[in-house]
Swiss-Prot record:
Keywords: 4Fe-4S, ATP-binding, Chlorophyll biosynthesis, Chloroplast, Iron, Iron-sulfur, Metal-binding, Nucleotide-binding, Oxidoreductase, Photosynthesis, Plastid. It catalyses: chlorophyllide a + oxidized 2[4Fe-4S]-[ferredoxin] + 2 ADP + 2 phosphate = protochlorophyllide a + reduced 2[4Fe-4S]-[ferredoxin] + 2 ATP + 2 H2O. One of its GO terms (cellular component) is chloroplast. Its main location: plastid. It comes from Anthoceros angustus. This is Light-independent protochlorophyllide reductase subunit B. Binds 1 [4Fe-4S] cluster per heterodimer. The cluster is bound at the heterodimer interface by residues from both subunits. The gene is chlB. The active site is at D299. Component of the dark-operative protochlorophyllide reductase (DPOR) that uses Mg-ATP and reduced ferredoxin to reduce ring D of protochlorophyllide (Pchlide) to form chlorophyllide a (Chlide). This reaction is light-independent. The NB-protein (ChlN-ChlB) is the catalytic component of the complex. NCBIfam families: DPOR_BchB. GO terms for biological process: light-independent chlorophyll biosynthetic process; photosynthesis, dark reaction. Pfam families: Oxidored_nitro, PCP_red.
Amino acid sequence: MKLAYWMYAGPAHIGTLRVASSFKNVHAIMHAPLGDDYFNVMRSMLERERDFTPVTASIVDRHVLARGSQEKVVDNIMRKDKEECPDLIVLTPTCTSSILQEDLQNFVDRASISVNSDVILADVNHYRVNELQAADRTLEQIVRYYLDKARRQGKLNQSITDVPSANIIGIFTLGFHNQHDCRELKRLLKDLGIKINQVIPEGGFVEDLEKLPKAWFNLIPYREVGLMTAIYLEKEFGMPYVSITPMGIADIVQCIRQIQKRVNTWTHFLLNQKLDYELYIDQQTRFISQAAWFSRSIDCQNLTGKKAVVFGDATHASSMTKILAQEMGIRVSCAGTYCKHDAEWFEEQVQGFCDEILITDDHTQVGDTIARIEPSAIFGTQMERHIGKRLDIPCGVISSPVHIQNFPLGYRPFLGYEGTNQIADLVYNSFTLGMEDHLLEIFGGHDTKEVITKSLSTDNDLTWNSESQLELNKIPGFVRGKIKRNTERFARQNGITGITVEVMYAAKEALNA
């Protein structure tokens, strides 16, 4: 457990709740004290959905501490079963309630006898794993539970579909542009003649999980969630998977070729033919995606050699690093991730594409690195956006955790060919470019001497003495800039070159007159 005012990945129970609330007709019960139950508020605020968050908090209070939790937890499970009639109820403790060392599995077993829903306890060590690892583990646990159940009941049909099909695994609630990415992946697979078998967990039903083995292969767009499930399905049912994230032209090509390889394993026998996607890749790269020609344009060449820092989850940070270095000629001074559990893979991916690698979940270390490097732009999470504002460095957000502005209503995927256009726009708009650079250097803004920047003065003919600077600093930040501009404007109009406290008050009086 760690006390911090900013965490890149939250506690384990948040990951479990994200997976549970992504499925349709699944209810989660969180065994937690007040304070750990913020998930409902967070999801309701951020996700653009009309449905209520299907999570109930079974609060650990003084009565529970005195008598134990069994009665309360079992009552909550039975009540929710009666009210909501869910297919599955997932019970999860939090790292705080885990301190009580109660046998929650026993509570689940007892409740299961009296309810119609399936009930499982999230099999997660809340002290050892973070939000993303817990989400990955919970998804695998739910998939395993329902496939084992179907096998026991003799309902498991392992015959594959007549036409090429895929499962998309790892799209879930509160993910970074996940809904948009999912639409783009569906479009990509449709173009390749591949049917969607299942998308899990987002929008899926647990009763349909028994159909997962019917697909020809599994597509895992994000390493953080879905990989454990794919490995389990490969081991148990021999299902191949593709885990190359189709983000950026080069990786989209690699992903499509990997899909072609997986599909041709079966088409050779079932359809007596082999599929070739090279023409599709060529058409999309040259004529559909704007990013390929944009990266060769004079606009993009202005970015060549500019420094950038990239930080985020392993999937997005590694892909973004390769896009900047390979496709846009931007120098990535530092690439980093907060996914310490996936450090080895991340280092392998970005090796040779950046000057240094940073593996940390400490935001102060990231801030210090950015301040030391002084890049032209940052590509990171919401925290890097805050750091950028403090250091006056533009920041493009490319990874969770994010705030409301990165849950857009419009269509903004980061994956697939449309995703390449979005990324090109984001990169280009994040840098201060061309003539803008010169104007800022010469005038501190546009071509007028009347513009005042954040520094104390843009002109050498105006100087603030120590008393006036001290007085200015006493003024609250949200109006300080306005007062400074008004004072300097008054000084220029009256031919004053040295600003004193008296000048400040004279400017105030003149403005109020």
